Curated annotation (Swiss-Prot):
This is Rho family-interacting cell polarization regulator 2. Acts as an inhibitor of the small GTPase RHOA and plays several roles in the regulation of myoblast and hair cell differentiation, lymphocyte T proliferation and neutrophil polarization. Plays a role in fetal mononuclear myoblast differentiation by promoting filopodia and myotube formation. Maintains naive T lymphocytes in a quiescent state and prevents chemokine-induced T lymphocyte responses, such as cell adhesion, polarization and migration. Involved also in the regulation of neutrophil polarization, chemotaxis and adhesion. The gene is RIPOR2. The lineage of its organism: Eukaryota, Metazoa, Chordata, Craniata, Vertebrata. It comes from Bos taurus. Residues 48-59 have a biased composition (Basic residues). One of its GO terms (molecular function) is 14-3-3 protein binding. It is found in: Cytoplasm; Cytoplasm, Cytoskeleton; Cell projection, Filopodium; Apical cell membrane.
Length: 1016
C-alpha cells in the first residue's frame, strides 16, 4: 500500500513525524510532558561513541565467491546500482553547471583568491565525475561478461537435458561428461564475477535516528536492536528517558552491500535480567538504497505499525577509506573526521522527517566520499505478512519509483526533485529468451495452419497450453515423449557417429549449420507417425503457468510468514517442522529422476540455439541482412535473440520445419536443487508439485489470518483447526514424496481412507487425468459436475445447477467470493482439498449434499431479488432453525444487503439479525463467520461484516474492530469506528483509547509529511 503526500511537517527541524506516545492512565501533566517531548528538539542524553564501526572483517571483501550463481538477483542489483550511479552523475553535473555559471559571473567583480577556490572546487567535481564514469564502465563490463557466462551456462544446461533424454551410449556419455565440465566451469566463472561485482557496490552508512512508538514508548523502557546483513552484525541498546528523549550506545554503522542478502532487523524490549520481549522482526530489501541522496527510513517493526525504527541510510559508491591517489593520508583522516563529526552532532531522539539544516552548500569531502549535496529523501517502510512473500504496491505519486515486488519487502522512494521521465528506465526489464514456456512462442498477426487429416487424427491439444501460432505456422510444438523418441531414433541409427562437426566459418549461423547436419529426412516421417498416435495431455503444465511462482517461492513465502510468529502457537511450530521436513526431502531427491520425470521438451535445435549469440561473423551479417547478432551491443544485448534471426532461419531451412520443438524448461537456472543440478526444486511429478505449491500458499494465507485475529480467541481457534488439517496434509505429502518418489497411479495410495467414500472417489477419478491424480482444474470439476448432476439439481431447483456448482468449488477452495468464470481454468483443486472439505462437512453422498447446497443457493437468490416489504417478509420466514447451521452463503448475502443503498432492505436484514442473534447456535456461527471475514482482503466483505456485527451487538469482536480502525482505507476505518461506538460501554472505551493519539501518526504521517509508506 502506497501512501504519499507533500506538505510541511511540524515535527521539528529534522522533519521526521513524531509519534505521540499513548499516555495510558497517567496524570495530565505527565501526558502533556510526553506529547511535548515529541516536538521539542533539545539535545538528548548521549552515551559516548568511540569511533565509527565498520564491518570490514565480516564483509564481502574477504569472503569466498558464492557456491551457486544468482542471475536474477544479480540483474536486479545491477539495475539498482546503475540507476544509483547515474543519479550521482546527474547530481554532480547539476552542481558543476551551477558552479561554472557562478564562476563566469564572478570573474569581473571578485578577488583572485575567491576565483581560485571556486576553480579548484570545479576541478574536484570534474575529477570525481571522471572517477564515477570509470566506475560505471567497469560495472557494465563485469555485467556484460556475467551475461555471456550465463548464456553459456544456460546452453550447457539445455545440452545436458537433451542428452539425458537420449539413449545411453559411449559417445553420448563422453559428450555428456564434457558438457558437465563446461557447465561447472561456466558456473564457477559466474560466481567469480558475482564476487567481483559485489566489491563494486560501495557501502551503506546506517545512522540510528531512534524509535517512534504509538502507545508503546514509556520512560524507563529499554530496547535492544539487532541488525544482520549477511555475515555483518550490529547490536545496540537504548533507553527511553523521562523527557521522552532516547539514548543509544551506538549511533552509526557501515555495512558493505551484498548481492544476495537482505537486512534483517529484530527489536527486543529488555524487561529484566532474564526477561526479554520480542517486539518484532522484519526483513528489508536493499535494492532501493542505491541512491545519491541520504534516505530517512521508517520501518514498521510490528504488524500494526505501532513501533517504528527510524534510520538514516546513505549510500557511498566508493569505499570511504578508498581514496583517490591524489588525496594523501592527511586528507583521508580529515575527511573521516569531518564525516564523524557530522554524524555526532547529537544522540538520536524521537525523530522527525525533514532536516532543513542538512547541507546548504557542497562540502569539500563530498567528492572524496561520494556523498551528494542534496536534500534527504524521506521514505517509510511498513512490513506485513503477504502470501508467497510478494508485495503489492498501490498507485502512488507520478514520480514514485516503480518496481516489481518479489519474495521480500521492497523500499519505495519518492523524490520530488527528479522529473517523472528520469525514472522511466526503471521499468525496463531484462528478458531472457533462453528459457520459455510453451505459451510464450505465440506471435500476433498469424493464422493457424490447417492440419491434414492424417496429422490431426489423435493429436491431443493440451489444455491450458494451446498449440501456438507463429511467424512460421508450420512449426509444431511437441511434448516430451515426441522429443525423446526423435532423439532416440536419430541416435540409434548411427550410435557411433557422435563426433565433432566440422563447420564452415563462412557459411553463416552456427545453429543453422549444426541443425542442417544433425537432421535427416527420416525424422519428419517419425514425427508424423508419433503425432498421429496422440500425445500426453499437458493440463498440469497449463495450470502451473497460472500458479504464483515455483516450489521455492511457495516455501520461501511460508517461511517468511511463519518466522516472526513461530513461537506464538504450537500449530505454527508443527507446521514449520513439517514444511522443513518436506523441503529437505525434495532437496535430497536424485537429479536423474527429476530430469527424466519432469515435463521437459528439449530437442537438438532448442539446445543449440542457446549458443547463437557466440556467432560474431561480420561476413554472416553482410550475407544476410535480416540476421542480427547483438553481442557487445550493451548490457541487454547478450540476452536478445531477435525474432528476425529466428524467422530467417526458418525460411533458409524448410527441411527442418515440423519436427523441432521450442518448448523449453520453465526454469533452467540453478536454484535450491541438489548438487548444482540445473533443474528447479521438484518431486519429479508435475501434479504433485502443483499440489504442494497450492497447499503451501493456503498455509501462508491461514498463518496471516491467524496472526491478524490472534486477539480474538474463538476466531483464531477456528483458523488453527483449519491449519491443523493442513499440517496433516503436509505429513501425507512428505510421505508420498519420500517413499514413492512422486510416481503414484492411484489416489488411494495417497489417501487410504478414500476407499470408504466410493462415490466421492469415483467422481474425483472422473475429474483428474491419469498422469495428474493429485489435482484438477476448477473448470474441469465444474464441467464434470454438470455432466453428472446438472439434471438432478435442475429437476428440484430449476436453473440453479450452475450457481450451485460454482458455490461448491468456491467453498472447497475456501474463497470468500464466488470464482469468476475467467479464473476457473487457472484455479487448481487438489485431491487433499477435495477430500478434506467433504470429510469436515460429514458428506459421503455428493448428490444429497448438492441438494442441500441448492436449497441454500435458492434462499440466497431469493434474498438478492426481493426488495423492501417482500424482503422483510422473506427474512421473517427465514427462521434461524431453517438450516442445520446458518450457511456461509446466506450469512454473506445478508451482510452484503446491509451495504446496499436500499434502506428498506438494510432495515429488514438488521431486524432479522437482531432477532436471530437470540438463538445461541445461530449467533455462534454468525459471529465466527463475520469475525473471520474481517481478516479477508476483500474491502466490501469487511465493510459488510462490520455492519452485521453491529446488528448482532457482538462485543466479542471489539479487539478485531480496533485493529480494523487502523486500516489504510478510510471507509473501512469509519465503518469500524461506528461499529465500535455501537457496542455499548466497552466499545466506547476501546474507541476512546484508540483516539488518544492522532490517526495521522498511525498512518506514519501520511498527511503531514513528504513520505511514502509501503506495506510488504
Amino acid at each position: 500500500m502506497l501512501v504519499g503526500s507533500q506538505s510541511f511537517s511540524p515535527g521539528g527541524p529534522n522533519g521526521i513525524i513524531r509519534s505521540q506516545s499513548f499516555a495510558g492512565f497517567s496524570g495530565l501533566q505527565e501526558r502533556r510532558s510526553r506529547c511535548n517531548s515529541f516536538i521539542e528538539n533539545s539535545s538528548a542524553v548521549k552515551k559516548p561513541q568511540a569511533k565509527l564501526k565498520k564491518m570490514h572483517n565480516l564483509g564481502h571483501k574477504n569472503s569466498s565467491p558464492p557456491k551457486e550463481p544468482q542471475p536474477k538477483r544479480v540483474e536486479e542489483v545491477y539495475r539498482a546500482l546503475k540507476n544509483g550511479l547515474d543519479e550521482y552523475l546527474e547530481v554532480h553535473q547539476t552542481e558543476l553547471d551551477k558552479l561554472t555559471t557562478q564562476l563566469k559571473d564572478m570573474r569581473r567583480n571578485s578577488r583572485l583568491g575567491v576565483l581560485y577556490d571556486l576553480d579548484k572546487q570545479i576541478k574536484t567535481i570534474e575529477r570525481y565525475m571522471r572517477r564515477l564514469e570509470f566506475h560505471i564502465s567497469k560495472v557494465d563490463e563485469l555485467y556484460e561478461a556475467y551475461c555471456i557466462q550465463r548464456r553459456l551456462q544456460d546452453g550447457a544446461s539445455k545440452m545436458k537435458q537433451a542428452f539425458a533424454t537420449s539413449p545411453a551410449s559411449k559417445a553420448a556419455r563422453e559428450s555428456l561428461a564434457e558438457i558437465n565440465r563446461s557447465y561447472k566451469e561456466y558456473t564457477e566463472n559466474m560466481c567469480a564475477i558475482e564476487a567481483e561485482l559485489e566489491k563494486q557496490l560501495g557501502e551503506f552508512s546506517i545512522k540510528m535516528k531512534g524509535l517512534a512508538g504509538f502507545a508503546r514508548l514509556c520512560p524507563g523502557d529499554q530496547y535492544e536492536i539487532f541488525m544482520k546483513y549477511g555475515r555483518q552484525r550490529w547490536k545496540l541498546k537504548g533507553r527511553i528517558e523521562v523527557n521522552g528523549k532516547q539514548s543509544w550506545d551506538g549511533e552509526e554503522m557501515v555495512f558493505l552491500p551484498l548481492i544476495v542478502g537482505f537486512i534483517s532487523i529484530k527489536v527486543t524490549e529488555l524487561k529484566g535480567l532474564a526477561t526479554h520481549l520480542l517486539v518484532g522482526s522484519v526483513t528489508c530489501e536493499t535494492k532501493e538504497l542505491f541512491a545519491a541522496r541520504p534516505q530517512v527510513v521508517a520501518v514498521d517493526i510490528n504488524d500494526l505499525g505501532t513501533i517504528k525504527l527510524n534510520l538514516e541510510i546513505t549510500w557511498y559508491p566508493f569505499d570511504v577509506e578508498d581514496m583517490t591517489p591524489s588525496s594523501g593520508a592527511g586528507n583521508k583522516v580529515a575527511a573521516l573526521q569531518r564525516r564523524m563529526s557530522m554524524y555526532s552532532q547529537g544522540t538520536p531522539e524521537t525523530p522527525t522527517f525533514k532536516d532543513h539544516s542538512f547541507f546548504s552548500n557542497l562540502p569539500d569531502d563530498i567528492f572524496e566520499n561520494g556523498k551528494a549535496a542534496e536534500e534527504k529523501m524521506p521514505l517509510s517502510l511498513s512490513f506485513s505478512d503477504l502470501p508467497n512473500g510478494d508485495c503489492t504496491l498501490a498507485p502512488g505519486p507520478a514520480d514514485s519509483l516503480p518496481g516489481a515486488c518479489a519474495a521480500n519487502p521492497e523500499i519505495t522512494i519518492t523524490s520530488t526533485e527528479l522529473p517523472p521521465g528520469s525514472q522511466s528506465s526503471q521499468n525496463e526489464g531484462l528478458k531472457d529468451s533462453s528459457s520459455a514456456s510453451c505459451s510464450s512462442s505465440s506471435r500476433e498477426g498469424s493464422e493457424p495452419r490447417p492440419h491434414p487429416e492424417g496429422e490431426t487424427q489423435g493429436l491431443g491439444k493440451p489444455e491450458g497450453c494451446p498449440v501456438a501460432t507463429g511467424a512460421r505456422p508450420e512449426r509444431l510444438f511437441l511434448q516430451k515423449g515426441v522429443a525423446e523418441a526423435l532423439l532416440q531414433e536419430a541416435l540409434l541409427q548411427e550410435p557411433s557417429e557422435l563426433k565433432p562437426v566440422e563447420l564452415d566459418t563462412f557459411e553463416g549461423n552456427i545453429t543453422k549449420q549444426l541443425v542442417k547436419r544433425l537432421t535427416s529426412a527420416e525424422v519428419p516421417a517419425a514425427t508424423e507417425r508419433l503425432l498421429s498416435e496422440g500425445s500426453i495431455s499437458a493440463e498440469s503444465e497449463g495450470c502451473r503457468s497460472f500458479l504464483d511462482g515455483s516450489l521455492e517461492d511457495a516455501f520461501n513465502g511460508l517461511f517468511l510468514a511463519l518466522e516472526p510468529h513461530k513461537e506464538q502457537y504450537k500449530e505454527f511450530q508443527d507446521l514449520n517442522q513439517e514444511v522443513m521436513h518436506l523441503d529437505d526431502i525434495l532437496k535430497c531427491k536424485p537429479a536423474v529422476s527429476r530430469s527424466r520425470s519432469s515435463s521437459l521438451s528439449l530437442t537438438v535445435e532448442s539446445a543449440l540455439e542457446s549458443f547463437d549469440f557466440l556467432n560474431t561473423s561480420d561476413f554472416d551479417e553482410e550475407e544476410d541482412g535480416d540476421e542480427v547478432c547483438n553481442v557487445g551491443g550493451g548490457a541487454d544485448s547478450v540476452f536478445s535473440d531477435t525474432e528476425t534471426e529466428k524467422n530467417s532461419y526458418r525460411s533458409v531451412h524448410p527441411e527442418a520445419r515440423g519436427h523441432l520443438s521450442e518448448a523449453l524448461t520453465e526454469d533452467t537456472g540453478v536454484g535450491t536443487s541438489v548438487a548444482g543440478s540445473p533443474l528447479p526444486l521438484t518431486t519429479g511429478n508435475e501434479s504433485l508439485d502443483l499440489t504442494i505449491i497450492r497447499h503451501l500458499q493456503y498455509c501462508t494465507q491461514l498463518v496471516q489470518q491467524i496472526v491478524l485475529s490472534s486477539k480474538t480467541p474463538f476466531v483464531a481457534s477456528n483458523l488453527l483447526e483449519k491449519l491443523s488439517r493442513q499440517i496433516q496434509v503436509m505429513e501425507k505429502l512428505s510421505a508420498v514424496s519420500d517413499e514413492n518418489i512422486g510416481n503414484i497411479s492411484s489416489v488411494i495410495e495417497a489417501i487410504p481412507e478414500f476407499h470408504k467414500k466410493l462415490s466421492l472417489l469415483s467422481f474425483w477419478t472422473k475429474c483428474c487425468t491419469p498422469i495428474g491424480v493429485y489435482h484438477s482444474s476448477a473448470d474441469r470439476v465444474i464441467k464434470q459436475l454438470e455432466a453428472s448432476f446438472a439434471r438432478t439439481v435442475n429437476r428440484d431447483y430449476p436453473g440453479l445447477a450452475d450457481p450451485v456448482f460454482h458455490t461448491l468449488v468456491s467453498q472447497i477452495l475456501d474463497r470468500a467470493e464466488p470464482l469468476l468464470p475467467a479464473s476457473l481454468s487457472s484455479e487448481v483443486i487438489t485431491v487433499f482439498q477435495y477430500y478434506s472439505y467433504f470429510t469436515s462437512h460429514g458428506v459421503s453422498d455428493l448428490e444429497s449434499y448438492l441438494n442441500q447446497l441448492a436449497k441454500q443457493v435458492s434462499v440466497v437468490q431469493t434474498l438478492q431479488s426481493l426488495r423492501d416489504e417482500k424482503l422483510l417478509q422473506a427474512v421473517s420466514d427465514l427462521a434461524p432453525g431453517s438450516f442445520p447451521a446458518p450457511q456461509e452463503e446466506v450469512l454473506r448475502t445478508l451482510a452484503l444487503l446491509l451495504t446496499g443503498e436500499d434502506s428498506g432492505a438494510s432495515e429488514a436484514v438488521t431486524l432479522y439479525l437482531t432477532a436471530a442473534s437470540r438463538s445461541e447456535h445461530f449467533r455462534e456461527k454468525a459471529l465466527l463467520y463475520y469475525c473471520e471475514a474481517l481478516t479477508k482482503t476483500d474491502f466490501r466483505l469487511q465493510k459488510a461484516a462490520c455492519l452485521a456485527l453491529k446488528s448482532l451487538k457482538a462485543t466479542e469482536s471489539i479487539k478485531m474492530l480496533v485493529t480494523l480502525c487502523q486500516s489504510d482505507t478510510e471507509e473501512i476505518r469509519n465503518v469500524a469506528s461506528e461499529t465500535l461506538l455501537s457496542l455499548g460501554e466497552d466499545g466506547r472505551l476501546a474507541y476512546e483509547q484508540l483516539d488518544k493519539f492522532p490517526r495521522d501518526c498511525v498512518k506514519v504521517g501520511g498527511r503531514l509529511a513528504s513520505e511514502v509508506a509501503t506495506a510488504f
